[in-house]
Amino acid sequence: AHSMGGCVGSLLIEEYPEYFDAAILNAPMMGINLLGIPKPIVKAFVNAAIGFNKGASFAFDHQEFIPNEKVEIKKSSTKSKARYLYVSDLRNENIYYQTNGATFSWVNAALEATGNIFKPKQLKKINIPILIVQAEKDNLVSPKAQDKFARRTENTKIIFMPQVEHDTFNSKEDFLQAYYFELF
């Protein structure tokens, strides 16, 4: 599972451990990159926005999907220009791929979900091997939260991927070879 799917996957493993033999979590969202802003301040701001009926508004510097917008690759979550352009073309052609920024309600739900992952009662239920693929240059999720998860579970291993962004599977060829070798 990747990113937000890693959050959902972690919660499922905690709630229904009997359905899983092992898991690979790729740059899992076990915490959000809050850009150095303390979580209580973010929560207060998000709750205020929701209180003023702005839950459906885009949070902070996020925005809706803009078709055919050219984003500089250095601002993306990958460094492979070919893979970036391929995914960009897919997103432009298919309305179901046209997701983009987070709303205040999404941030609120994400903070709640990532907090639930770390409840001690839930963590104790995890009894399967878990492999976390951690991207050094992840600008969307918190690698520190992934480290915390690994420390608090008995059978979690982290594969640290240096110089790699959040979209690990869209990285350059040299990284992907090491990535797939490690996983398979």
Q: What is each residue range found by the language model?
A:
Residues 147, 151-167:
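Catalytic histidine neighborhood in serine/cysteine hydrolases
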Residues 162-184:
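Catalytic active-site module of serine/aspartate enzymes centered on a nucleophile-bearing elbow/loop
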Residues 128, 141-151:
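Short alpha-helix in the alpha/beta-hydrolase fold that links the catalytic acid
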Residues 9-98:
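Alpha/beta-hydrolase-fold enzymes
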Residues 102-122:
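Active-site nucleophile elbow and catalytic-triad environment of alpha/beta-hydrolase enzymes
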Residues 24, 131-133, 159:
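Hydrophobic/aromatic beta-strand patches that form the interior of the parallel beta-sheet core
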Residues 1-5, 9:
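Gly/Ala-rich beta-loop-alpha elbow adjacent to hydrolase catalytic centers
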